[in-house]
Amino acid sequence: SLKNVIRKELDSIKKEFGSQRKTIVEDAKEAVYVAAPIKEETVYFVMDRFGYSKTMDKATYQRNKENILKEYKFIVPCMNTDKICIFTNLGVMHQIKVLDIPAGKFRDKGVPIDNLCNYDSTKEYIIQVLDAESMIHSSLLFATAKSMLKVMDGELLNAAKRTVQATKLSEDELIEVIPVDWTEESEDKVVLQ
């Protein structure tokens, strides 16, 4: 029958071209791959007035501190495992993992912040940049163009999403976000200019 003919042909092909199995099939435990832990270190997130950003290690920052303070609009010390929080005039907070921001030397140009998060420089502009770790342990004072003030616990903005509405604005514009450490007894004053 046709079935036997096919079997004989397959057996002859197996004998002619067959080889021994190179791997062992066994009932073993599941393979677990452990990624090497990231060494935590202090880095500096810097962004110039054109929105080009990068991180640099502490030694590079210390060597070029004077020039960095002149050339960069935002300078944020943070851990390399932390997140950077960018507040815009629309009341939106964008988050970027520090590990996603390319590290560079002092003279390197950096990467546009538009390419790293959902920030769009054609519709909004940056008013404050903070590191997430210090932000969640302090209160934030929001000030708008119409002189409205709001104090909010930074822990409320600790979210997994990359873009969060930090505060609602009704036909207004956020002009400042200030981290503050107020207590019930403190009598700190805020002066808007």
What are the residue ranges of the model-derived segments?
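C-terminal interaction appendages of subunits in large macromolecular complexes
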Residues: 1-193
